A protein has these predicted regions:
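Catalytic cores of secreted/periplasmic lytic hydrolases that degrade extracellular macromolecules
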Residues: 2, 18-179
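Bacterial N-terminal signal peptides
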Residues: 7-16
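Positively charged n-region of N-terminal signal peptides that target proteins for export
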Residues: 1-7
Length: 179
């Protein structure tokens, strides 16, 4: 009896490890697909707006759950950008820091990328970030947090971890989009 309980314990522990591994593998696969799909767009925006492609990709991955979050699916909003008073486009309401907050809604994901780049480039609170070296993703991540892009106090560390885990910094030095 003791041997079968011991065996059962090992079996349950093994199943738990396999389940955690499968979840980790699903996340890895969804992140890789997202990166493959949007890296060229992030590189284009880096060239046009001088926002590191690694930062754009990491923010898109985190804010949208690799495009799979409820908000991303309902609104094509991959950056968690809220409506603000000057927003005249589509809207969707989503629980975030508060219930029923207004978020920007886009026709296409590409429109979300365009708006994200303009959002950073045209707001004075982010101005100092554009003085950083394009390869300084750590400076950008910390700067976004200091400027109040997100309310999460660990936002910069999360961006940096995603950039380093998925080697997104390689896109900051890309000469052109992949074919």
């Amino acid at each position: 009896m003791r041997l079968s309980l011991h065996f059962l314990g090992i079996l349950l522990l093994s199943l738990a490890c396999l389940s955690a591994g499968a979840e980790s593998q699903r996340k890895l696969t969804s992140y890789q697909k997202y990166i493959s799909k949007y890296s060229d767009l992030a590189i284009q925006h880096q060239k046009k707006y001088r926002i590191p492609a690694s930062i754009t990709l990491a923010q898109g991955l985190l804010e949208s759950g690799a495009g799979q979050s409820d908000l991303a699916r309902r609104s094509n909003n991959h950056f968690g950008i809220k409506c603000h008073s000057d927003w005249r486009g589509g809207r969707v309401y989503h629980d975030d820091d508060l219930r029923g907050e207004c978020f920007r809604k886009y026709k296409r994901v590409e429109d979300s990328y365009d708006d994200h780049s303009r959002f950073l480039a045209e707001r004075s609170r982010y101005e100092r970030l554009f003085k950083l070296n394009i390869k300084d993703y750590k400076g950008w991540a910390k700067g976004l947090q200091k400027c109040g892009y997100a309310t999460d106090r660990k936002y910069a560390n999360k961006l940096i971890k995603v950039i380093e885990d998925y080697e997104l910094y390689q896109y900051d030095t890309a000469k052109k989009e992949r074919k």
